[in-house]
């Protein structure tokens, strides 16, 4: 699965002190929907569209100012508090295991991201990140390539 993952050095990562609106602008410009929030080397949570939505819904009077930090979303960042699911796996995860994981729905929650870490835990060193598009989108690409191959 590592062959299909976005390598850690190419993943936008945040810390609790990052400005939320600036991060949201970057996410929008780059087309990212989930940003790992790291502190002391470990993934402490995920900043996402649903984090922002939950924050605004819970605290409608606070708004999002230039001074709003990722830390202000603290209660909505832990992977356990998301409406989506996140999986942590080691580098030995295969493409087919990742594909199967993305195809499953658990308690009405879809798998949004697989974080590949050195030891398969959220405290392990981040190696890469897989999204459903990284894995499930390959079938369409392969089919499209096969369709344009000249007949033998």
Tell me what each language-model feature is.
Residues 13, 22-68:
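Acidic (E/D-rich), amphipathic helical modules within compact regulatory domains
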Residues 10-13, 42, 88, 125:
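Short, flexible active-site loop motifs that bind/organize anionic cofactors or intermediates
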Residues 5-8, 14-17, 21:
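The feature marks the first
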Residues 1-10, 48-111, 131-152:
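Tandem CBS (Bateman) regulatory domains
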Residues 27, 35-52, 102, 106, ...:
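A glycine-centered beta-loop-beta connector
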Residues 19-22, 26, 97-101:
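Well-ordered alpha-helical segments embedded in enzymatic catalytic cores
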């Amino acid at each position: 699965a590592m062959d299909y993952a976005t390598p850690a050095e190419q993943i936008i990562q945040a810390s609790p002190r990052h400005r939320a609106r600036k991060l949201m602008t970057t996410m929008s410009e780059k087309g990212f929907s989930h940003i790992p929030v790291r502190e002391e080397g470990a993934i402490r949570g995920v900043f996402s569209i649903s984090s922002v939505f939950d924050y605004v819904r819970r605290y409608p009077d606070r708004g999002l100012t230039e001074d709003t930090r990722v830390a202000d979303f603290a209660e909505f960042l832990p992977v356990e508090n998301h409406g989506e699911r996140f999986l942590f796996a080691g580098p030995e995860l295969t493409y087919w295991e990742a594909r199967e994981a993305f195809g499953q729905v658990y308690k009405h929650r879809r798998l949004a991201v697989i974080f590949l870490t050195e030891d398969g835990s959220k405290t392990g060193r981040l190696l890469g990140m897989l999204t459903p598009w990284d894995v499930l989108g390959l079938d369409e690409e392969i089919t499209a390539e096969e369709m344009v191959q000249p007949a033998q």
